[in-house]
C-alpha cells in the first residue's frame, strides 16, 4: 500500500523487518520445544537465543543469489549464530515457518484493528447520544419516507460496528493457528509434540490437520471479515456524501481552516474523505475475491497463493485500519445541521405524514382503498406543486373533515408520534 493510506503502527507490522522477526520467533520456539523434548542440546538453544539476528538487506542480497527467501533468511541467521545454527530449522519445511509466522502477523494486525474499532464504537455512541432527538426525514429509495432522528440512524451504524467487533474477536481465535508438521504435514521428520509446545510458546494452537500449508479457507475468512468492515464503512461514508449534497446539507464533513475544496471553484466544500473511503472499500473487496482464489491449491500445496498474499494480506489490513481511523475522525467531527433537517422534513407541507393520515382515516371507519385514494390525491397534488402543502389540502378535503376534527388532523402531523419507541432501540444498544 502507498504511504498515503498507511498508518505507522499497522505499516510496521507488515514491514520486512517485522516479518523476519516473526520468522525468527518461530524458529526459536521450535528449537526450545526440541530441547525440552531432548532432541537438541539446551546449550545450543541458549547460544541461538543469545546470538540469533538478521539483517534485512543482507537477506535480500542472499536471496538474489539463491532465489529462495527462507534459505536466504536461514543463511543470514547462521552468519550470526555460528555452529549452533545447525539446529535451526531441523525437520522443518519453509511453510512451517511462513504460515506460523503469518498467523502472528495477522493476530497482531487484528489487535490493532480491534483497538481502532473500539474508538469508532465510542465515537458513534457519543454522536448517537448527542442527536438522540434530532428529528430528520427518513428516506427509502432516496425519496422522503417518514420522520426519524439522526441519532436513530447512528444507532443502526453502532449495531453494525458491534457485529463487526464480535466477528473480529471470533477471528482472533480462528486465525491463531500454527503448523510445525514438515513436508506434506505428516510429521515424518519432526515430533508432533514439538508442534504442540512451539505453538503454545507462540500463543497459537496446532492446526488440526494441515497439509504442507495451513488451509487457505482460514485466510479467506480473515480477509472477507475485513471486507465486511470496509463495506460498512463505505455505507457510512456514502450516507455522509448523500446528506452533504448542496440541496440536502443535513450533515457535512468538518472543513478545516485553510482547507481548499477545488482548484477552480473557491466555494466548494467537497466530502473528499468520504469519497476516499468509498474508493478504498473497493480495493478491500477486491482482495476478498483474491484470497478465495487461494483456497484451491494443488494437492498438499503449491505456491500460487504466495504472490497473492504478499500483496493482499498487508493491503487488506493496512487499508481497513486506515478506513476505521478515518471514519472515526469523520464521525467525531461531523457537522450536523438540525435546522436543515427540519426544513427538509417539512417540505411539501408535511407530505411525509401521509401514512399517519391514512391509518387514522381507516381507524375512523373508511376502508383502506378509499382512504388510500383520498390521501394519495392530496399527497401527489402537494408533491407536484412548488408551493404544495399537504396539510392544507387534507384540512380542506371534506372527505377528511367529515371523519377527523382539526385536533385529530393536527395530531397526524406530530413527528413525536414516530419517535415514541426509539428509546427501546437505545436501551438495546446501551446508549
Where are the model-predicted features located?
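Alpha-helical support elements that line or immediately flank enzyme active sites
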Residues: 32, 105-117, 226-235, 240, ...
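Conserved hydrophobic residue
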Residues: 40, 248-249, 367
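Glycine-rich cofactor/substrate-binding loops
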Residues: 1-22, 62-66, 83, 265-431
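Glycine-rich anion/phosphate-binding loop at the beta-strand->alpha-helix junction
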Residues: 164, 213-305, 310
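Active-site-adjacent "gating/activation" loops or surface patches in catalytic cores
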Residues: 195-212, 216
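A helix-coil-helix interface module used to build multimeric assemblies
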Residues: 1-187, 191-197, 206, 259-262, ...
